[in-house]
């Protein structure tokens, strides 16, 4: 058993803006697209969420829900700098840190001797340090496995904490909605619901082999998570897994020819980014992404060990076959990166070591 903490900053980008510009406090605020150009909300504060505004929502729709919504373009460099401050705080407690984004990370504190090894007290201390040194609040989840730590961090937001001790895992997962399991999105949840599967308890009672036959490898993962099993360790590799570029179009486009006109600029920018951040890395796939005007999206990928411009156009044609008459509002291209030959695989830690838990 391990002691895993998942730290998730509360409405991070918006919180930084409210910290630096007090006039925004207490007012609905969103970081993202402007009123003039089309775009999407990156994040918003809790005042905006009361009106139904959410991350990844079209800016125009968000303004309909909340006409007084304050929109700011965002300051990514500032967000990165604050994230580095937070990362430095994590390092005081453990070297086993897996960043998921600028505002969240997993920490394995199994060997941390502070607070007599209590993961609960360690999480509280980390949150206190973050607040004292950055002026921002964080929520935390503490559990013996990764996915439950992430679930727990969302239960007492904002500025809260939830602990799931090892002896409570089995009971906790029984009533857990399958939507809380990573990989179970809306479409998968609907498929599971059609089988009468809505909670982990439902999966526990369902024939395992039938789930595997229906869902393949994901069926195996689903059964494990539903039983409170997650043997993934903390990955401390910092290598990028992909490089991509995408653009939200000023107006919807509808034809393959229109999309093809957008591609050269995307491919050129992708080439530049590969040169800057992935020089010498081998690729293992190419990907084209389309987002439609109903905000659903599709991706087409092709396994390859070299970048082919022709293949990007072929993938675009395949993606357009899924258009179904919808307008296209976003187009993106990316490549998946193989591990560097001179680096080790991500360090997977504490898979089997048994520890005395002090939660």
Swiss-Prot record:
Site residues, Substrate discrimination: 13
GO cellular component: cytosol
Family: Belongs to the DNA polymerase type-Y family.
Protein name: DNA polymerase IV
Pfam families, per database record: IMS, IMS_C, IMS_HHH_1
Any single biological process term in GO: error-prone translesion synthesis
CDD domains hit by this protein: PolY_Pol_IV_kappa (cd03586)
Annotated ranges, domain UmuC: 4-185
GO molecular function: damaged DNA binding; DNA-directed DNA polymerase activity; magnesium ion binding
InterPro entries: DNA/RNA_pol_sf, DNA_pol_Y-fam_lit_finger_sf, DNA_pol_Y-fam_little_finger, DNA_polymerase-Y, DNApol_IV, IMS_HHH_1, Rev_trsase/Diguanyl_cyclase, UmuC
Bilayer-spanning residue ranges: none
Keyword Transcription regulation (UniProt): no
Entry function: Poorly processive, error-prone DNA polymerase involved in untargeted mutagenesis. Copies undamaged DNA at stalled replication forks, which arise in vivo from mismatched or misaligned primer ends. These misaligned primers can be extended by PolIV. Exhibits no 3'-5' exonuclease (proofreading) activity. May be involved in translesional synthesis, in conjunction with the beta clamp from PolIII.
Reactions this protein catalyses: DNA(n) + a 2'-deoxyribonucleoside 5'-triphosphate = DNA(n+1) + diphosphate
Cofactor note: Binds 2 magnesium ions per subunit.
Organism this protein belongs to: Shewanella sp. (strain ANA-3)
Highest taxon, organism lineage: Bacteria
Residues that, per the record, bind Mg(2+): 8, 103
EC numbers on record: 2.7.7.7
Subunit structure: Monomer.
Swiss-Prot/TrEMBL keywords: Cytoplasm, DNA damage, DNA repair, DNA replication, DNA-binding, DNA-directed DNA polymerase, Magnesium, Metal-binding, Mutator protein, Nucleotidyltransferase, Transferase
NCBIfam families (UniProt xref): PRK02406.1
Reported cofactor(s): Mg(2+)
Lineage of origin: Bacteria, Pseudomonadati, Pseudomonadota, Gammaproteobacteria, Alteromonadales
Active-site residues (renumbered): 104
Main location: cytoplasm
PROSITE patterns per UniProt: UMUC (PS50173)
């Amino acid at each position: 058993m391990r002691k895993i903490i998942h730290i998730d900053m509360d409405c991070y980008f918006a919180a930084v803006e409210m910290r630096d510009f007090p006039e925004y406090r207490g007012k609905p605020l969103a970081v993202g697209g402007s009123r003039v150009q089309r775009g999407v909300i990156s994040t918003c504060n809790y005042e905006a969420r009361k009106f139904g505004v959410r991350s990844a929502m079209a800016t125009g729709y968000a303004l309909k829900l909340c006409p007084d919504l304050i929109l700011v373009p965002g300051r990514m460099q500032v967000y990165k700098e604050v994230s580095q401050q937070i990362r430095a705080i994590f390092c005081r407690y453990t070297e086993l840190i897996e960043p998921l984004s600028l505002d969240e990370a997993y920490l394995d504190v199994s060997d941390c001797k502070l607070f007599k090894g209590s993961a609960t007290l360690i999480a509280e201390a980390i949150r206190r340090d973050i607040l004292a040194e950055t002026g921002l609040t964080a929520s935390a989840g503490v559990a013996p496995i990764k996915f439950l730590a992430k679930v727990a961090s969302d239960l007492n937001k904002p500025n809260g904490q939830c602990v799931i001790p090892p002896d409570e895992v089995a009971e906790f997962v029984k009533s857990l909605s399958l939507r809380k399991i990573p990989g179970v999105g809306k479409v998968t949840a609907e498929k599971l619901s059609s089988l009468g599967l809505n909670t982990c308890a439902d999966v526990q009672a369902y024939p395992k082999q039938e789930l595997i036959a229906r869902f393949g490898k994901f069926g195996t993962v689903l059964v494990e998570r539903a039983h409170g099993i997650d043997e993934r360790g903390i990955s401390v590799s910092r290598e990028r897994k992909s490089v991509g570029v995408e653009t939200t179009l000023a107006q919807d486009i509808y034809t393959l020819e229109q999309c093809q006109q957008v591609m050269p600029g995307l491919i050129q920018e992708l080439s530049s980014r590969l040169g800057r951040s992935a020089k010498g890395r081998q690729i293992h796939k190419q990907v084209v992404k389309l987002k439609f005007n109903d905000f659903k999206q599709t991706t087409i990928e092709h396994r390859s060990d070299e970048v082919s411009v022709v293949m990007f156009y072929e993938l675009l044609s395949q993606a357009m076959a899924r258009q179904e008459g919808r307008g296209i509002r976003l187009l993106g291209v990316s490549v998946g990166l193989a591990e560097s030959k001179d680096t080790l695989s991500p360090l997977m830690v504490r898979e089997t070591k048994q520890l005395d838990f002090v939660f």
